Amino acid sequence: MKSIILSLLLLATSIISVAQKAGWKKACDNPEFLHRSIKEVTDVIVHDIYSPPVASRIYAYTTVAAYEAAHFSDSKYISLAGQLHGLSALPAPTAGKPYCYSLAAVNALLLVAKSMIISEDKIAAFQAGILLEFKAAGMPDEVYDSSLAYGKLVAGSIIAWAAKDHYKETRSLSKYPVGNDTTSWKPTPPAYIKAIEPHWDKLRPFLIDSAQQFKPLPPTTFSADKGSQFYKEAKAVMDAGLSLTPE
């Protein structure tokens, strides 16, 4: 009798173990893994105090990396290669190998993020923790290893693509010259921040041919005359600032 009970217990344990391992796919396909990874990138962007244009560049390349590593999970989605300027064909998954594309996407996103921010250690610490969560879900070693490797391949291609967008070249260009005359823009209190990214137009665009496709109208002509359009617009801004409410 005892041997029968022991056999039943072993069988039950085996069934539970198999069921738990079979559930890893559902657990690992949870979009929260990707959402949390992007949130971590946001937190580091804020910590490192990147300007909005530079932050937008980080978001663009990291999310393209995640998409490119994940889109093979659904045949309805296609690669952005050939659609975004300068992005050529990316590595494809090896036929016959098992993958968790959610893990591949998270790994690709975080690897690209580490290449673009100052606080690499913060991203690395988060990455180590979230990869352990994938592993703890019961993902088979073969799937785990192949998914990490594929995410790394995609990340490498995206990092190489990003390196050619002329961002690095703009780091050594001259700052925006601030004029002394009354018509010139000047940094304002309280931070007196310098003009942000005056050479951003020199970066490779993602989709449009150039900024000329959406050329804005020229700014209102400066004038201190109280009847001028410039004076009216400037006063409207001042009045709005003076009448702000807590909301």
Residue positions per predicted region:
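Bacterial Sec-dependent N-terminal signal peptides
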Residues: 1-24
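Acidic/polar surface patches and capping/hinge elements
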Residues: 20-247
